[in-house]
Amino acid sequence: MASELDNLPVITTRREEAQGFLQGLVSKGLGWARKYSLFQYPFVTACCGMEFMTVASARYDLDRFGAALPRFSPRQADLLIVVGTVNCKQAPILRRVYEQIAEPKWVVAFGVCASSGGFYDNYATVQGIDRIVPVDVYIPGCPPRPEQVLDGIMLLQQKIQGQQHKLIDRKPLPVVGQEPISR
Ligand code: SF4
């Protein structure tokens, strides 16, 4: 005689399927919302800053990507844009700023100096900020044209939309200063 317990695996599977379906919808919705509400923290160190200001001007209209408003506190930002050359003395400061941004967060390397050290191939310059923080999008150029920056922002939006987003993320809290560089 069949008991109630015989049905449990099927019920569990259906519940898991439903949860997976709902999680997929939530993830898609959160991804859509997050990719259009990027609050950038510009970490500007060098000449690329002039081009960064151009991108922020009305002509290129960053607002249509939901990324117009810079935040000057990492606690209010979710997108760290590193603009320009980073030297070894600045490296711990950059890492500290990254750690102060709440999850979920993303990083863009703006220009060849931030991406790879550029032509400053010397002992004092960090040869790419991915040695200090994980980078989501690299924008080439010295300095990059505003169109390249917009292209980079759109690439980042695609990446955000494709990521898994949860309403509540139960990851253990990191110990400040001891997190690994990769995510
Ligand atoms: S990439 Fe070129 S413009 Fe940008 S900070 Fe380096 S040297 Fe300056």
Swiss-Prot record:
GO BP term (any one): electron transport coupled proton transport
Residues annotated as binding [4Fe-4S] cluster are C47, C48, C113, C142
**Where found, per UniProt?**
Cell inner membrane
Q: Which reaction does it catalyse?
A: a quinone + NADH + 5 H(+)(in) = a quinol + NAD(+) + 4 H(+)(out)
HAMAP family the record matches: NDH1_NuoB (MF_01356)
What family is reported? Belongs to the complex I 20 kDa subunit family.
The entry describes its oligomerization and partners as: NDH-1 is composed of 14 different subunits. Subunits NuoB, C, D, E, F, and G constitute the peripheral sector of the complex.
- Per its record, how is this protein called by name? NADH-quinone oxidoreductase subunit B 2
Provenance organism: Anaeromyxobacter sp. (strain Fw109-5)
Write the lineage as a comma-separated list: Bacteria, Pseudomonadati, Myxococcota, Myxococcia, Myxococcales
